[in-house]
UniProtKB/Swiss-Prot annotation:
Residues forming coiled coils: none
Family: Belongs to the tubulin family.
MF (Gene Ontology): GTP binding
InterPro entries: Gamma_tubulin (IPR002454), Tub_FtsZ_C (IPR008280), Tubulin (IPR000217), Tubulin/FtsZ-like_C (IPR037103), Tubulin/FtsZ_2-layer-sand-dom (IPR018316), Tubulin/FtsZ_GTPase_sf (IPR036525), Tubulin_C (IPR023123), Tubulin_CS (IPR017975)
An individual GO BP term: cytoplasmic microtubule organization
Known function: Tubulin is the major constituent of microtubules. The gamma chain is found at microtubule organizing centers (MTOC) such as the spindle poles or the centrosome, suggesting that it is involved in the minus-end nucleation of microtubule assembly.
Residues the entry annotates as binding GTP: 142-148
Disulfide bonds: none
Lineage: Eukaryota, Sar, Alveolata, Ciliophora, Intramacronucleata
Protein name per Swiss-Prot or TrEMBL: Tubulin gamma-1 chain
Keyword entries, A-Z: Cytoplasm, Cytoskeleton, GTP-binding, Microtubule, Nucleotide-binding
Length: 462
């Protein structure tokens, strides 16, 4: 039986994609912007209680905590048609309202100052759950609040709820979004590696390219990019909200995709893609084979250049629509025959498939749609760009004074050195995973602290 998940939205980007996610969920479950269930959705078979709970007046409230150090985005949410959807007690805006100034150190230290207030909100949500399974964090790793505050929150959640799963939807930036982003990204990466069980990488560069090339948007807006993200988030949770026999809880989804503890960074693909307010311009017949084949194409992968080299560790395709299971079997056979997916040599070379219902409350221009969640060694190319940019900055100590003004860096820069080691280790681990002798790799390295063959111990997370 599906269990509850609490969503934590941190920073400008985290709250923007969180807002789009809740809009999407409301539409898929027949809930109006005020949280009231529409007449036509009264007898649904969906599980709304995974992400929503019902207030005393029976309107649906997201199990969400909204956090930001500057008020603009959350104020916008509170003035939107969805203003009364959220629990006002679960909204935190810094009293100073100045933001974190794109400084990871400020975001991290500000989080430490208000941790009791935040944990109290989360505890209250957790206490209202019958059987809490875990947390979802939405944030960006480029700025100050999503990266710094988000990092501190990951550490605290890990300490405070050691047996609960933590999944993140983390936006990785375009190359020149923020001048100090190599520092912010590296420091955030350490926490994503050590304190999260699963990270869905949302590569802004790839998302923008997909919006231009596939949706034919000349200059994609933030809401349009965020709408693509919300489509991915909603599709990745569809088996939890419309449960079947398999993949109907978060632990099942993650365990099937994460073969070793550190290699828990996933890339995504989605097809056919369209925006809610966009007319479908190309009409084609969507079959299971067509969808599954397209999901493996580079142009549909939401991570820049990530699958040009390397190999898949695992693939889970969530296929939505009216699907005959025999078609799935035939499609998998065809993909195997054509060798469309290159897998690691030491693991099972198979694509897992989860079949899911489509929401009966939303019109779709396509009979079948699909989301791919994939663990691919090539994702390290994104991490290597961050790491190399960081090393270039660090050699010159560029902009380091900005960080030295914060408490965590006022005495030393050990946190940078520690993050450097952890990220470098992940990049090496990911490269080693492509070789047959990976199961013996790192045995002499005391810092690794785990057997690469051992799956994450999800069984204890009850």
């Amino acid at each position: 039986m599906p269990r509850e998940i609490i969503t934590c939205q941190v920073g400008q980007c985290g709250n923007q994609i969180g807002m789009e996610f809740w809009k999407q969920l409301c539409m898929e479950h027949g809930i109006n912007p005020e949280g009231i269930l529409e007449e036509y959705a009264q007898n649904g078979e969906d599980r709304k209680d995974v992400f929503f709970y019902q207030a005393d007046d029976e309107h649906y409230v997201p199990r969400a905590v909204l956090i930001d150090l500057e008020p603009r985005v959350i104020n916008g949410i509170q003035k939107s048609p969805y203003a009364s959807l959220y629990n006002p007690e679960n909204i935190f805006i810094s009293k100073h309202g100045g933001g974190a100034g794109n400084n990871w150190g400020r975001g991290y230290c500000d989080a430490e100052k208000v941790q009791e207030e935040i944990i109290e909100m989360i505890d209250r949500e957790a206490d209202g759950s019958d059987s809490l399974e875990g947390f979802v964090l939405t944030h960006s790793i480029a700025g100050g609040t999503g990266s710094g505050f988000g990092s501190y929150l990951l550490e605290r959640l890990n300490d405070h709820y050691p047996k609960k799963l933590i999944q993140t939807y983390s936006v990785f930036p375009n190359e020149n979004d923020v001048v100090v982003q190599p520092y912010n990204c590296l420091l955030s990466m350490k926490r994503l590696i050590l304190n999260a069980d699963c990270v869905v990488v949302l590569d802004n560069t790839a998302l923008t390219s997909i919006a231009v090339d596939r949706l034919k948007l000349l200059q994609p807006t933030f809401p349009q990019i965020n709408s693509i993200v919300s489509t991915v988030m909603a599709a990745s949770t569809t088996t939890l909200r419309y449960p079947g026999y398999m993949n109907n809880d978060l632990v099942g989804l993650i365990a099937s995709l994460v073969p070793t503890p550190r290699c828990h960074f996933l890339m995504t693909g989605y097809t056919p893609l369209s925006l809610i307010d966009q007319k479908v311009t190309s009409v084609r017949k969507t079959t299971v084979l067509d969808v599954m084949r397209r999901l493996l194409q580079t142009k549909n992968i939401m991570a820049t250049g990530a699958i040009k080299k390397g190999a898949y560790m695992s693939i889970l395709n969530i296929i939505q629509g009216d699907v005959d299971p025999t078609q799935v079997h035939k499609s998998l056979q065809r993909i195997r025959e054509r060798k469309l997916a290159n897998f690691i040599p030491w693991g099972p070379a198979s694509i897992q498939v989860a079949l899911s219902k489509k929401s009966p409350y939303m019109e779709s221009g396509h009979k079948v749609s699909g989301l791919m969640l994939a663990n691919h060694t090539g994702i390290r190319s994104i991490f290597k760009v961050i790491y190399d940019q960081y090393r270039t900055f660090r050699k010159r100590d560029a902009y380091m004074n900005i960080f030295k003004q914060t408490k965590i860096f006022e005495d030393n820069l050990d946190e940078f050195d520690s993050s450097d080691e952890v990220v470098k280790s992940l990049i090496e681990d990911s490269a080693a995973a492509e070789k047959m002798d990976y199961i013996n790799w790192g045995n002499d390295d005391d810092d690794m602290g785990y057997d690469p063959r051992a799956p994450p111990n999800f069984s204890s997370m009850q």
